[in-house]
Amino acid sequence: MRYPFLRLAVFLAACIAPVWWLYQAWIFALGPDPGKVLVENFGVATLVMLLITLSMTPLQRLTGWSGWIVVRRQLGLWCFAYALLHLSMYALFILGLDWGQLGVELVKRPYIIVGALALLGLLALAVTSNRYSQRRLGARWKKLHRIIYVILGLGLLHMFWIVRADLKEWALYAGIGAFLLLLRIPVFARRIPRLGGAAKARSVKVQNNG
């Protein structure tokens, strides 16, 4: 296994927020409506983890370090785990596990449908994020995993629909997401500098001048 300590660090870092929030809920430190806070926290955490996952490829191109790509799958799976926790908190604290209310909720809050579509997309990516699926799907695997961009759009729309009264935080995430998508466009991707390459070029230049 490559970069075992990096993988362990990612695992521990990803565990911190859920454990801390659940502990706060346990000691009644999340205010009068801890269930709502947990739903919101895990929803935002899912979006943040998705953005972090999408940043791995540009960071690899920028630095030339393969460690970013090594943990990309792990981060993506954590994104899916956060989304499942978001759904679980919603089912437990908002629905009260009363699935008969779900139809009413979907009519009253259609952004739930958008979130559900994003979750289904993450499920498809999580299920196929293994070497067997890569071999089985071949070229189609890469096409399938491009739906991560659609998932980002759905996630941002889901959040926008919920917090449209105060868009400051949403605008930050949307701006980061737009920037990361821009870096995927070939004409911009080719312009990402290589920090390692630049340092190497300077070193060669100094040696030549010496």
Swiss-Prot record:
Compartments in which it is found: Cell inner membrane
Transmembrane region(s): 8-28, 37-57, 75-95, 110-130, 147-167, 169-189
Species whose genome carries this gene: Pseudomonas syringae pv. syringae (strain B728a)
Cofactor(s) needed by this chain: FMN; heme b
MF term (GO), any: FMN binding
Membrane topology annotation: Multi-pass membrane protein
GO biological process, alphabetically ordered: protein repair
InterPro entries xref list: Fe3_Rdtase_TM_dom, MsrQ-like
Entry keyword set: Cell inner membrane, Cell membrane, Electron transport, Flavoprotein, FMN, Heme, Iron, Membrane, Metal-binding, Transmembrane, Transmembrane helix, Transport
Entry GO terms, CC: plasma membrane
Quaternary data: Heterodimer of a catalytic subunit (MsrP) and a heme-binding subunit (MsrQ).
Listed name of the protein: Protein-methionine-sulfoxide reductase heme-binding subunit MsrQ
Family annotation (HAMAP family): MsrQ
Protein family per UniProt: Belongs to the MsrQ family.
Cofactor note: Binds 1 FMN per subunit. Binds 1 heme b (iron(II)-protoporphyrin IX) group per subunit.
Function in brief: Part of the MsrPQ system that repairs oxidized periplasmic proteins containing methionine sulfoxide residues (Met-O), using respiratory chain electrons. Thus protects these proteins from oxidative-stress damage caused by reactive species of oxygen and chlorine generated by the host defense mechanisms. MsrPQ is essential for the maintenance of envelope integrity under bleach stress, rescuing a wide series of structurally unrelated periplasmic proteins from methionine oxidation.
